[in-house]
């Protein structure tokens, strides 16, 4: 039995037909056995060929005399170039500098094969590493990454020489696969007909990996279950399900080899697994997640009456650990001041993203997928930011400052020029939205290089979601009503917001005033988009300008009533030296009308302090107007 039959590859005759089709596709320039970048019709090649410093002009496939293998090699690069996966720089520079060694190796080792899939990947990679080492070529490279402890650590990886061959061979393992994507042990979401809401485009998670199962039966069971879960769950969550179930069934295979089917499971095996989890030193919330995934599998098997189901209840409510109430992981002002003082050292787009997330507190996926045209402007010239909430599957609008709106406008102009075909405000080179890891990585690289530390002197580790916690915590600490914070952050339930409801002793009234002046007076407050996307909606404008306000004859008091009654607000109405006449009657009537409007809103929202303050103003105005008109 040859290697390809073991790996579920199509027959040799089918491979020959596919290779014939490849040759038909590669016409004109692509039919040549030597690719000259100066003659390549691909747009990225035309641009790159203008570079006077370009040293690698040719890719010479004629070094491989085996015609079958040569066609596969050419098509491998042709496919990646013409499907937008790679550009000319990748082919002629990044891979072009290492390709000759691979071509010579293939010509030497496999002169007679009719497809690269005749050779097992593991065998070819071992032989190639030996080949390179004997010729003094490095097979590994050292990269550096910032760890979770904010330490710079060297990481060994395969060199480009090695990865080039590995990518080539894996491409044809997939290209010649005999079956559907679901039949593979690695599911690539790019090859699955998944709806957009199942895939978060800001994550690098492209695959669900079922390799590594010690028991083939349990692997097939988990694959079937994961395919079912993809009907309702996100791709990333199903990937986690596959990993956790693999851990459980491998534990079972190592400790209880006699258990070969689900119906053979008892509490003995489950309790042993629970003990294993508790000895791993992981958080209670993580343990809860793993138990929940396992219970989800068992309950599904029972409800849907699969052939192999648990013979009894295996998991009970008391198996779940008690989870401590989570505290928001906010970023201390001490750290934020350092971050903001070094924004100029970040790439322009990362600095802009940092300013936006500090003000709006959106989730990282929402920040990365902001689109061109996300700014809305009302009749007063104030701005709102519209974005899509991946978690809640809905659009959301929050008011933003004119300063941040200007940054967004500048960014939009730049992106429209550089990436006219991309819909995103922060696109990658291929036009897709920026990945979350890029944003986190740049911030933590900055923290390491600029020595951004916490109060204990340790280099600070930035987590993107901490900006959201910071906005929520700051709003609650400064007296913002919880339901308003809930609206601003786009939380589905009050429970999601209540985690921010803790107060710090160092909160001062002047800081509170400064906070509200920014988020209420200048930025306004949160408003949900109505069906017509009208930011000039009356209720929206009331939220923007009047939450926690007191009416004055010529405007509104900017000191929130929730911070305590202001002794100066409408002081003339209570002053014994105050006097007025009929000539001021229109102003009094206008102020009364505005006060009544604000009072109605306050009563409707049950804002008791605002009701008390504005009721007093209303009574005094009615007395004055009554006297003037009586």
Curated annotation (Swiss-Prot):
<feature type="active site">
    <location>
        <position position="491"/>
    </location>
</feature>
<dbReference type="GO" id="GO:0003677">
    <property type="term" value="F:DNA binding"/>
</dbReference>
<protein>
    <recommendedName>
        <fullName>Transposase B from transposon Tn554</fullName>
    </recommendedName>
</protein>
<dbReference type="GO" id="GO:0006310">
    <property type="term" value="P:DNA recombination"/>
</dbReference>
<feature type="domain" description="Tyr recombinase">
    <location>
        <begin position="326"/>
        <end position="513"/>
    </location>
</feature>
<dbReference type="InterPro" id="IPR013762">
    <property type="entry name" value="Integrase-like_cat_sf"/>
</dbReference>
<feature type="active site">
    <location>
        <position position="391"/>
    </location>
</feature>
<feature type="active site">
    <location>
        <position position="465"/>
    </location>
</feature>
<dbReference type="InterPro" id="IPR050090">
    <property type="entry name" value="Tyrosine_recombinase_XerCD"/>
</dbReference>
<keyword id="KW-0238">DNA-binding</keyword>
<keyword id="KW-0233">DNA recombination</keyword>
<keyword id="KW-0814">Transposable element</keyword>
<dbReference type="GO" id="GO:0015074">
    <property type="term" value="P:DNA integration"/>
</dbReference>
<feature type="active site">
    <location>
        <position position="468"/>
    </location>
</feature>
<feature type="domain" description="Core-binding (CB)">
    <location>
        <begin position="216"/>
        <end position="302"/>
    </location>
</feature>
<feature type="active site" description="O-(3'-phospho-DNA)-tyrosine intermediate">
    <location>
        <position position="500"/>
    </location>
</feature>
<keyword id="KW-0229">DNA integration</keyword>
<comment type="function">
    <text>One of three proteins encoded by transposon Tn554 required for its transposition.</text>
</comment>
<dbReference type="InterPro" id="IPR044068">
    <property type="entry name" value="CB"/>
</dbReference>
<feature type="active site">
    <location>
        <position position="363"/>
    </location>
</feature>
<dbReference type="Pfam" id="PF00589">
    <property type="entry name" value="Phage_integrase"/>
</dbReference>
<dbReference type="InterPro" id="IPR010998">
    <property type="entry name" value="Integrase_recombinase_N"/>
</dbReference>
<comment type="similarity">
    <text>Belongs to the 'phage' integrase family.</text>
</comment>
<dbReference type="InterPro" id="IPR002104">
    <property type="entry name" value="Integrase_catalytic"/>
</dbReference>
<dbReference type="InterPro" id="IPR011010">
    <property type="entry name" value="DNA_brk_join_enz"/>
</dbReference>
């Amino acid at each position: 039995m040859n290697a390809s039959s073991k790996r579920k590859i199509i027959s040799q005759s089918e491979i020959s037909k596919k290779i014939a089709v490849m040759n038909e596709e590669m016409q004109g320039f692509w039919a040549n056995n030597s690719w000259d970048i100066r003659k390549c019709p691909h747009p990225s090649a035309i641009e790159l060929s203008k570079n006077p410093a370009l040293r690698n002009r040719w890719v010479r496939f004629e070094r491989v005399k085996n015609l079958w293998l040569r066609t596969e090699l050419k098509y491998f690069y042709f496919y990646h170039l013409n499907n937008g996966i790679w550009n000319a720089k990748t082919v002629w520079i990044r891979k072009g500098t290492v390709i000759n060694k691979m071509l010579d190796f293939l010509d030497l080792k496999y002169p007679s094969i009719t497809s690269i899939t005749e050779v097992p990947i593991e065998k070819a990679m071992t032989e190639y590493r030996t080949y390179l080492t004997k010729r003094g070529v490095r097979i590994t490279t050292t990269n550096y990454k910032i760890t979770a402890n904010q330490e710079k650590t060297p990481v060994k990886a395969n060199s480009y020489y090695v990865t080039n061959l590995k990518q080539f061979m894996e491409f044809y393992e997939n290209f010649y696969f005999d079956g559907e994507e679901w039949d593979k042990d690695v599911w690539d979401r790019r090859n699955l007909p998944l709806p957009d809401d199942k895939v978060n485009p800001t994550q690098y998670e492209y695959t669900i990996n079922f390799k590594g199962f010690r028991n083939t039966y349990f692997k097939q069971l988990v694959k079937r279950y994961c395919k079912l879960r993809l009907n309702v769950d996100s791709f990333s969550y199903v990937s986690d399900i596959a990993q956790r179930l693999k851990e459980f069934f491998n534990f079972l295979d190592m400790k209880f080899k006699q258990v070969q089917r689900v119906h053979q499971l008892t509490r003995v095996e489950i309790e042993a697994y629970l003990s294993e989890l508790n000895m791993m030193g992981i958080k209670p919330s993580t343990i809860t997640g793993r138990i929940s995934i396992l219970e989800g599998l068992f309950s599904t098997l029972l409800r849907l009456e699969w052939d192999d189901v648990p013979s009894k209840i295996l998991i009970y409510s008391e198996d779940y650990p008690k989870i401590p109430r989570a505290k928001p992981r906010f970023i201390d002002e001490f750290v934020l001041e350092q971050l903001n003082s070094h924004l100029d050292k970040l790439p322009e787009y990362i600095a802009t993203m940092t300013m936006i997330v500090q003000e709006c507190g959106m989730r990282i996926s929402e920040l990365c997928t902001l689109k061109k045209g996300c700014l809305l402007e009302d009749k007063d010239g104030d701005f709102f930011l519209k974005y899509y909430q991946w978690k809640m599957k809905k659009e959301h609008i929050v008011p933003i400052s004119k300063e941040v709106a200007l940054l967004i406008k500048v960014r939009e102009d730049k992106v429209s020029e550089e990436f006219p075909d991309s819909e995103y405000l922060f696109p990658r080179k291929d036009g897709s939205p920026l990945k979350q890891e890029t944003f986190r990585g740049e911030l933590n690289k900055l923290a390491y290089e600029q020595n951004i530390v916490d109060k204990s002197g340790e280099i600070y580790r930035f987590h993107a979601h901490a900006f959201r916690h910071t906005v929520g915590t700051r709003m609650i600490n400064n007296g913002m009503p919880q339901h308003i914070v809930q609206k601003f952050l786009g939380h589905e339930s009050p429970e999601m917001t209540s985690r921010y409801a803790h107060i710090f002793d160092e909160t001062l009234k002047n800081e509170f005033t400064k906070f509200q002046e920014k988020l209420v007076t200048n930025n306004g407050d949160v408003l949900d988009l109505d069906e017509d996307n009208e930011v000039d909606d009356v209720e929206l404008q009331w939220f923007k300008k009047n939450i926690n306000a007191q009416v004055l004859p010529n405007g509104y008091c900017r000191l929130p009533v929730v911070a305590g009654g202001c002794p100066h607000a409408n002081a003339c109405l209570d002053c014994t030296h105050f006097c007025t006449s009929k000539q001021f009657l229109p102003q009094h009537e206008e102020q009364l009308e505005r006060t009544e409007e604000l009072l109605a809103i306050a009563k409707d929202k049950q804002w008791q302090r605002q009701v008390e303050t504005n009721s007093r103003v209303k009574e005094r105005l009615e007395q004055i107007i009554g006297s003037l008109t009586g």
